[in-house]
């Protein structure tokens, strides 16, 4: 428990100390008007209470990541605790805060527009397509799971297909309606349920005091079959430490923030909160695996077992609410982000419903096609999920490099994003070579290639920086 408690304290201290440090590097201007006022349109640009913006941002970026990702990552042992803490503080929170604040400074621009400003027009065009594809993947991935669970909880005639249709109808409403109509009203409630569930598990961890591994015991790889910690664990935990998906969600809330001084609690604070939730679930899952073995691969079963055992019937209800609501809410904001990215690209105003429908209908048709594939092919869903996970972390790589270029141009300490950018470049490059859905190469060779690619990218960066310094 000592390692767990120290990790928990480190996350909290990280928010107040490192968060303040990053805020100073960015240089907030509390007197500067935010896009919520300068571009107010009653649909996407709406000033909202800070507590509500925080809760929406937290739920937007969380989804099932800090629960399912942490549970899968816990199989790797104590190393998962360290990555959640170090990743959340020095990579994820910095990534989320700076991308959110740059969107705030640039009138709530979507992520591809921000990346284009600093990596060039070619990257912008590529990222427009890449990000929209990722958003549609997110929306598709986060429909099947909740629909299947709802089908099990309801009468037989209400099958998975029925619930997929219901979820998509909700998606359409949430994507089209002004941000304060559905998202602004129900998201804070779902976020509160997710937090309450995590707090309940945290309390029971201290009450039950289960035997958790300590860092002093070493960090053996406990994953069945000994899948390599690098890079597999760093992709598996995903949202619990760093996620490119977060940078696509931050512009949604950048359009609703009342003052730049609230950026740290909303962007940096949401990621730290997610890290805390991930750490709690990693600890609980470690206890579960200690008692039940490593055979269980369904994270939903682990959640159900832990909550019912520790929180009783009420905990089981909360678990169902979290497992159903979290992915659905991530899915609808993914489609909303996709709509805004396409709208920014086509310069289509979004005040009229017809203009919103013009973008939404093709996006939903693609998502439905992916869902049909995932339902017909027994491995379809797993394949979509694995490509989503890699795409998600790859997006974080592009975002971190764009942020690094911004800091260099602004004559600010760029090392705070350069180190995470290099590390995640190595992770994603190695993963695509070693993963079965990639090239399936031997791990040692994959790592050599991954690190070689990272060195080449660093060399390009240093050459560019030298030219920039001489201008």
Model region roles, listed by residue range:
Residues 20-46, 69-72, 86, 94-123, ...:
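Flexible loop linkers connecting adjacent transmembrane helices
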Residues 205-215, 261, 268-305, 375-379:
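Extracellular/periplasmic helix-exit of transmembrane alpha-helices
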Residues 5, 9-29, 130, 146-150, ...:
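Membrane-interface loop-to-helix entry segments
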Residues 48-65, 204-210, 218-279, 321-330:
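Hydrophobic, membrane-embedded alpha-helices of multi-pass small-molecule transporters
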Residues 1-19, 73-103, 112, 446-455:
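Extracellular loop-to-transmembrane helix junctions
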Residues 10-67, 232, 259-262:
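Membrane-interface "cap" regions at the ends of multi-pass membrane proteins
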Residues 10-11, 15, 91-107, 111-176, ...:
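Helix-loop-helix module between adjacent transmembrane segments
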Residues 139-165, 174-175, 194-221, 406-414, ...:
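Hydrophobic alpha-helical segments and their helix-loop junctions in multi-pass secondary transporters
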